[in-house]
C-alpha cells in the first residue's frame, strides 16, 4: 500500500531536478509514490522525468501544457493514491529521514497535517544526509483555530502559507 504520494511540479528545472528526485529516492521510508508533473518544460526537464520513470516503478509522470504551479499540483492530486500527500518543489532537496520522521509523528498524534521548517540555500554543494532530524523537542500540537490565528496575526506566516514542508492527510 502506498502511504505517501509525493507530488513534484516541474517547470524548467533541468539544472536541479535530478538532485531533488535523488533526495526523495534516498528516503529511509519506502512506502511512497512520486508523481512528477511536467508543466510544459522546454529545457529538457520532461526528458529527465521520463528517464527516472523508466527506471523507477514508483515514479509516474504527467506531461501537460503550462498552466502554472497550482495547476500542476492539482494534476498530481487527481491521481494521488497515498494515504498522505506531500508537495516538493523541483528545486528542493529533502532529508533522507524526512518521511519516516513525519509519518511517525502523524501516526502517534493521529494528526491530519505535519508542518516542518525549511532551510533556504542560494546554492547547495553537498547535502548533509547524515544529520539527525531534531524532532523530539520541537513538536507542537496545534488545533486548526490556533494555526488560523497565527496566520491572521502574522506569526511565522511563511511556515504556514507554502504547500512545501507539509505532509497532509489525503481525504480523497
Regions found by a protein language model. Give the residues of each.
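Nucleotide-sugar donor-binding/catalytic module of glycosyltransferases
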Residues: 1-172
Amino acid at each position: 500500500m502506498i502511504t505517501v504520494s509525493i507530488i513534484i511540479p516541474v517547470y524548467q528545472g533541468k539544472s536541479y531536478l535530478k538532485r531533488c528526485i535523488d533526495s526523495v529516492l534516498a528516503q529511509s521510508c519506502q512506502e511512497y509514490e512520486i508523481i512528477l508533473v511536467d508543466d510544459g518544460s522546454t529545457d529538457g526537464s520532461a526528458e529527465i522525468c521520463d528517464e527516472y520513470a523508466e527506471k523507477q516503478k514508483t515514479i509516474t509522470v504527467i506531461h501537460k501544457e503550462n498552466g502554472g504551479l497550482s495547476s500542476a499540483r492539482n494534476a498530481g492530486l487527481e491521481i494521488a493514491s497515498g494515504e498522505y500527500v506531500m508537495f516538493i518543489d523541483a528545486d528542493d532537496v529533502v532529508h533522507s529521514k524526512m518521511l519516516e520522521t513525519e509519518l511517525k509523528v502523524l501516526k502517534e498524534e493521529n494528526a491530519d497535517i505535519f508542518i516542518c521548517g525549511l532551510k533556504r540555500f542560494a546554492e547547495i554543494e553537498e547535502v548533509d544526509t547524515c544529520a539527525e532530524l531534531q524532532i523530539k523537542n520541537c513538536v507542537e500540537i496545534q488545533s486548526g483555530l490556533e494555526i488560523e490565528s497565527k496566520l491572521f496575526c502574522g506569526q511565522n506566516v511563511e511556515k504556514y502559507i507554502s504547500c512545501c514542508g507539509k505532509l497532509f492527510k489525503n481525504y480523497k
